[in-house]
């Protein structure tokens, strides 16, 4: 039986535009799914149903219908303020009080015409790829004994389970790509500075940038176009990327056309190999092999490339710790209520000297220069997105040092794209076989890392893989519930 959530975000937008469904009807459909299904998934921490209905009903009076996401239901990652709604930040350490103003990313999505259904779950302050917090557990819809990854945990689960047609997350070390890979989605981390509302210059190292989580490559292009479109709002970040796009056309067009022949490097090794025991599951290797096979059939050149052996891991850890050191300054915070991992990161961050932080930043700058140089002859570099299958609930444990090491071993290829500012996309090329020790049908993704400003090439290659592997037809059980 056909239902509205079976449509892609692009198709749904077109339906609304042509009058085959109203924004309110679409909003009601998705709210009903959230009410029926989310208790077993934990994608949302707050559902603002009445506010969503009121906005959808009056959307034509609030936002021009020409806006790129007009009428599409969405949700806000619970790290970003929406006026009148509490921002929980995945923590029990803060009082539950309504935010006074919208974060620029939230305002940009409103300006694009979306209808927010509420706030989606994130681990504490977005500082982990876990999906377990003191506020609750977010579960993977492909196997609810397993985690969806993080930190855009709730956003990924909501899209995969058909609770929203698409979502925007933020990615400071893999936080869009990790949960997208674990839940069978496309996840795109744009180049640093590409998205004006969140240009990647806040926080130490300029690591974080907003990006889409979608079921198809074309939907990812559509959301990226919306994120970079002028909003009519005051410019929050005057230093956003200004690479001219003249003649290249919208990102959506690149994703739909899927044209081009490129040179792809298949990466051997990771930047964490000297520090963490990175064990790559055969299913992760099989995903890369499947992608290599299809890319070769399409006509791309495929070569091996070795990971440069330059310092990285300790400097990244210092950057992560130093970003946690600011948390004691958050108004009203109760540090005794922090989870063990974040409390440990805060303590280590506060013990750092300014010289140590500056040295780490210098090391990461040198790493970026070396990495971009090593990748320069390729249009994209291919890695597994995750080294392992989606992790069981509780796998990270309570020891913070081991927790951090496990995060790095699980996603050893994601954070280097944040450090270098390069765009990267995860693509859900396969699932585990039935005879896999962790069970069959678990999503496995590959990552393509592009050149600076190279999102269109990543989207084009993703579209070529999608046409042949047809992952957009693969869904978890909740899809038909």
Located regions from the model:
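An N-terminal boundary/leader segment
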Residues: 1-53, 268, 297-299, 350, ...
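Residue-level signal for inorganic ion chemistry
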Residues: 30, 52, 220, 264, ...
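Short glycine/serine-rich loop segments
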Residues: 101-231, 418-431, 436-447
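Glycine-rich, small-residue loops and helix-cap segments
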Residues: 19, 71, 111, 164, ...
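Acyltransferase
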Residues: 20-28, 57, 250, 280-305, ...
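Acidic/His- and Gly-rich active-site-bordering loop/insert found
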Residues: 52-54, 62-134
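A short helix-breaking turn/cap at a secondary-structure junction
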Residues: 189-285, 468-481
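Short helix-loop capping/hinge segments that flank enzyme active sites or metal/cofactor-binding pockets
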Residues: 65, 69-89, 258-271, 275, ...
């Amino acid at each position: 039986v056909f239902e509205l959530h079976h449509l892609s975000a692009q198709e749904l937008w077109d339906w609304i535009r042509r009058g085959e469904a109203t924004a309110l009807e679409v909003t009601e459909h998705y709210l009903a799914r959230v009410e029926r299904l989310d208790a077993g998934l934990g994608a949302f921490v707050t559902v603002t149903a009445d506010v969503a209905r009121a906005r959808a009903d009056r959307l034509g009076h609030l936002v021009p219908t020409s806006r790129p996401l007009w009428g599409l239901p969405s949700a806000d990652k619970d790290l970003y303020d929406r006026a009148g709604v509490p921002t929980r930040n995945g923590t029990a350490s803060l009082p539950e009080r309504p935010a006074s103003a919208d974060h620029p990313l939230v305002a940009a999505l409103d300006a694009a015409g979306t209808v927010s259904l509420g706030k989606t779950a994130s681990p504490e302050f977005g500082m982990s790829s876990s999906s377990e917090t003191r506020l609750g557990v977010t579960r993977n819809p492909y196997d609810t004994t397993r985690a969806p990854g993080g930190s855009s945990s709730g956003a990924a689960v909501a899209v995969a389970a058909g609770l929203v047609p698409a979502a925007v997350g933020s990615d400071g070390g893999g936080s869009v790509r990790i949960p997208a890979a674990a839940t069978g989605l496309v996840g795109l981390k744009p180049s640093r500075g590409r998205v004006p509302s969140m240009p990647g210059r806040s926080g130490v190292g300029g690591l974080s940038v907003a990006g889409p989580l979608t079921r198809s490559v074309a939907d990812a292009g559509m959301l990226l176009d919306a994120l970079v479109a002028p909003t009519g709002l005051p410019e929050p970040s005057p230093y956003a990327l200004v690479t001219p796009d003249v003649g290249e056309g919208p990102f959506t067009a690149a994703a739909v056309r899927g044209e081009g022949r490129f040179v792809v490097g298949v990466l051997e090794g990771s930047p964490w190999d000297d520090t963490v025991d990175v064990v790559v599951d055969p299913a992760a290797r099989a995903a890369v092999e499947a992608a290599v096979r299809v890319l070769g059939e399409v006509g791309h050149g495929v070569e091996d490339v070795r990971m440069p052996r330059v310092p990285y891991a300790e400097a990244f850890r210092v950057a992560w710790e130093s970003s946690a050191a600011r948390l004691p300054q958050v108004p009203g915070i109760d540090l005794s209520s922090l989870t063990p991992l974040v409390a440990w990161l805060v303590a280590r961050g506060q013990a750092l000297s300014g010289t140590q932080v500056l040295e780490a930043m210098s090391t990461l700058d040198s790493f970026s220069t070396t990495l971009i140089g090593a990748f320069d002859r390729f249009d994209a570099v291919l890695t597994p997105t995750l080294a392992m299958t989606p992790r069981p609930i509780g796998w990270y444990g309570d020891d913070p040092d081991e927790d951090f090491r496990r995060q790095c071993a699980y996603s050893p290829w994601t954070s280097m794209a944040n450090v270098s500012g390069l765009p990267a996309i995860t693509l859900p090329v396969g699932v585990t076989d039935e005879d896999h020790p962790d069970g069959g049908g678990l999503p496995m993704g590959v990552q393509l890392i592009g050149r600076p400003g190279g999102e269109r090439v990543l989207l084009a290659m993703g579209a070529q893989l999608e046409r042949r592997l047809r992952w957009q037809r693969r869904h978890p059980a909740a899809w038909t519930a």
